[in-house]
Amino acid sequence: MKGTIAVNLTNGFGNNIFQYSAARLLAEHLDSDLVLIPPTKNYYGIKELENLGIKFVEKKLNNPINVIDKNYKMCYNDVLKGRDVILSGYFEDYTIYFDKLDQIKNWFKPVKNRKDNSLTIHMRTGDRLFMKNEFYTKPRAEHYLKAVEKFDFDELHIVTDMPKWDYVTADELNNMKFHLDVPANERVPIGESVKFFNEFIEGFEKYNPNVQKRSIVDDFNFIRASDNILFEHGTLSWWAAAISDAKKVGVYGPWRPWKGDKNKNLSNIPLKNWFKWE
């Protein structure tokens, strides 16, 4: 009788790609069924993931073994064949996926590389413009611009969660709704957030960037189809770049430095076409 590998999805599309990939790799290794458990019945990510070709099925689990990040790799053991396992974690460790990227790429609907010699920057702003715990370690516009100089490209695209790509005022930024609501005691002064974002608008004006509003899946696939990719520490953009045919990829080397010892190794993946920027 087949076992089942189930995984608890958390909030966040990029997180879900990691969770799905970790669960499916293990399920295929153990010849088990795969079950994805959304955080809520109305979770926005269900439709987005289904649009990628990921299926949601329900199955009752029988006395499942609970597995978290730190003991995930130990599950590649045939003694677990036929058993039910439930994964709970983020599984953000490039060594799990590095030598299986071609296999993982085949799980997703193919996208055609645009071959327009463009550079696509994924810029997660939104709620992260307010978060005090990470704001003062974030790369500024000048750091992005130095990284951009490492690419040879004809046009620039910016993929972002900002409702508009233009100068903002404090009132406008305060009234914008994002992925998460940041409590007042965890926010930086609004003036600093405004200055931070407006520096990007000013700095990138010379490139006349193309900025369009898309769905999460369309953003993911747009990045995947790019010749050149630059991003900071987004899990969505990490996966989009990892399974792309991009000629060159720049990833922010420190990744998420404010996490200290809990920082992940994702920027260290030794892919030949990737480089680190700071």
Locate predicted features.
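Nucleotide-activated donor-dependent transferases that construct or modify glycoconjugates
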Residues: 1-11
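Secretory-pathway luminal glycosyltransferase catalytic domains
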Residues: 3, 39-153, 161-166, 172, ...
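A structural signal for short, well-ordered beta-strand segments and their strand-loop junctions
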Residues: 6, 33-39, 120-122, 157-159, ...
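Donor-binding and catalytic core of enzymes assembling or modifying cell-surface/extracellular glycoconjugates
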Residues: 13, 154-266
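Histidine-anchored nucleotide/phosphate-binding helix
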Residues: 16-28, 144-148
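Acidic, PIN/NYN-like endoribonuclease modules and their adjacent C-terminal/linker elements
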Residues: 263-278
